[in-house]
A protein has these predicted regions:
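Alpha-helical multi-pass transmembrane bundles of energy-transducing inner-membrane proteins
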Residues: 69-152, 159-167, 184-185
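Short helix-boundary/re-entrant hairpin motifs in multi-pass inner-membrane proteins
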Residues: 16-19, 23, 29, 52, ...
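Transmembrane helix-loop-helix hairpins at membrane boundaries of multipass inner-membrane proteins
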Residues: 1-69
């Protein structure tokens, strides 16, 4: 949390994660961008995780370190998604977020009906990633970035965001019935929307 607070003084900052080779096959590589737009989101996500952990400490007599690890890992991936400098980085962060959420939810949810709803939600979010990949494929003449969006790919970007936020398909969040602890359940509800 403090590191994000101090990074405010060095905006904008770009961090190259990897250099994928060959450049003819991978025209863009994963990049993190910390600017005036992504910094407040990253700080809000880290503050949310800090609040969830602090309230978890004050609420329970024994601390569950696995819940803390899940919360911190999920928050770190949410911050990566908020700081994504290009759609490739966003797709990778979304996929990692979805896989961690799927594993944790399937381990914690017992009735078959709730597991089915977890898989349906995961499938809708995976379709959002595929829509973003389709947008990247349609803009093959110029590499897809958040500054240059081809007109034919904008509908797929909108569809991908709608699927990620739960707008399409219209469904109630499954976390109302899921037996999750308050801190982890709050993070699972708010982080993917961030």
């Amino acid at each position: 949390w403090l590191s994000l607070l101090f990074l405010r003084f060095w905006l904008p900052a770009t961090f190259d994660l990897l250099s994928w080779e060959p450049a003819s096959l991978f025209p863009v590589s994963p990049v993190l961008l910390l600017d005036r737009i992504s910094w407040p989101y990253a700080l809000a996500l880290s503050t949310l995780a800090l609040a969830a952990i602090l309230t978890d400490i004050s609420r329970s007599t024994e601390t569950n370190r696995l819940t803390w690890v899940g919360s911190l890992a999920f928050t770190a991936l949410g911050i990566l998604a908020a700081m994504a400098g290009n759609p490739l980085t966003l797709m990778l962060a979304w996929a990692a977020l979805d896989l961690i959420e799927l594993v944790i939810m399937l381990l914690r949810v017992n009735p078959v009906e709730q597991r089915e709803q977890v898989v349906i939600t995961f499938s809708a979010r995976a379709a959002g990633i595929l829509a973003l990949a389709a947008a990247a494929g349609l803009s093959s003449e110029i590499p897809l970035s958040f500054t240059q969006i081809a007109p034919q790919s904008s509908i797929f970007l909108l569809l991908g965001a709608g699927l990620r936020l739960g707008v399409f398909p219209l469904h109630l969040p499954f976390l109302e019935q899921a037996p999750l602890q308050r801190g982890l359940g709050t993070l699972f509800t708010l982080l993917p929307a961030g």
